[in-house]
């Protein structure tokens, strides 16, 4: 499957290019194999927007490939197969089981 993108709200700004830094709000779903269960959000108390460099492998493959086509202001849900998320190891600290499909709701805040 890779990554599937569903636009929730279109953006109106530029799209990031490989090597640029994007700042996003993100909420991840798929705790304990249940895509309705949140495991993490930058909107939770004590959290802040997350920044990463596109195409450098600093984040899961689903983010690198899914966010590159998004515009500033866009909100989209990315469904990532396990090989585009945390794979066979999962992410036990967040309750992500091995080989889990995950959903991420991402809002692009800025591109630099």
Curated annotation (Swiss-Prot):
What superkingdom does the record give? Eukaryota
Q: Where in the cell is it found?
A: Cytoplasm
What this chain does, per the record? Answer: PPIases accelerate the folding of proteins. It catalyzes the cis-trans isomerization of proline imidic peptide bonds in oligopeptides. Mediates rapamycin inactivation of TOR protein kinase activity.
What are the UniProt keywords, alphabetically? Cytoplasm, Disulfide bond, Isomerase, Rotamase
- PROSITE patterns tied to this protein: FKBP_PPIASE
Q: Which family does it belong to?
A: Belongs to the FKBP-type PPIase family.
Write the Enzyme Commission number(s) for this entry. Answer: 5.2.1.8
Q: Could you tell me which residue ranges the PPIase FKBP-type domain spans?
A: 19-112
Catalytic activity reads: [protein]-peptidylproline (omega=180) = [protein]-peptidylproline (omega=0)
Q: What is its main location?
A: cytoplasm
Protein's gene: FKBP12
Name of this protein: Peptidyl-prolyl cis-trans isomerase FKBP12
Q: What class of enzyme is it?
A: isomerase
Q: Does the keyword Disulfide bond apply?
A: yes
Alphabetized InterPro entries for the sequence: FKBP-type_PPIase (IPR050689), PPIase_dom_sf (IPR046357), PPIase_FKBP_dom (IPR001179)
The GO terms describing molecular function are: peptidyl-prolyl cis-trans isomerase activity
Task: Output the Gene3D superfamilies linked to this UniProt entry.
Answer: 3.10.50.40
Which residues lie within the region annotated Disordered?
A: 1-26
Q: How does it assemble?
A: Interacts with FIP37 and with the immunosuppressive drug FK506. Its interaction with FIP37 is inhibited by FK506. Interacts with TOR in a rapamycin-dependent manner.
What is one Pfam family matched by this protein? FKBP_C
Q: Report the SS bond pairs.
A: 26-80
Which cellular component terms (GO) are annotated to the entry? cytosol; plastid
Keyword Disulfide bond included in the entry's annotation: yes
């Amino acid at each position: 499957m890779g990554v599937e993108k569903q636009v929730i709200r279109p953006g109106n700004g530029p799209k990031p290019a490989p090597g640029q830094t994007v700042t996003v709000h993100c909420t991840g779903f798929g705790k304990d194999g249940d895509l309705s269960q949140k495991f993490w959000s930058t909107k939770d108390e004590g959290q802040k927007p997350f920044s990463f460099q596109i195409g450098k492998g600093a984040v899961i493959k689903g983010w690198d490939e899914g966010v590159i086509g998004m515009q500033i202001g866009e909100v989209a849900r990315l469904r990532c197969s396990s090989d585009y998320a945390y794979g066979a190891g999962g992410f036990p600290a967040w309750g992500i089981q091995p080989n889990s499909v995950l959903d991420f709701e991402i809002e692009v805040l800025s591109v630099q």
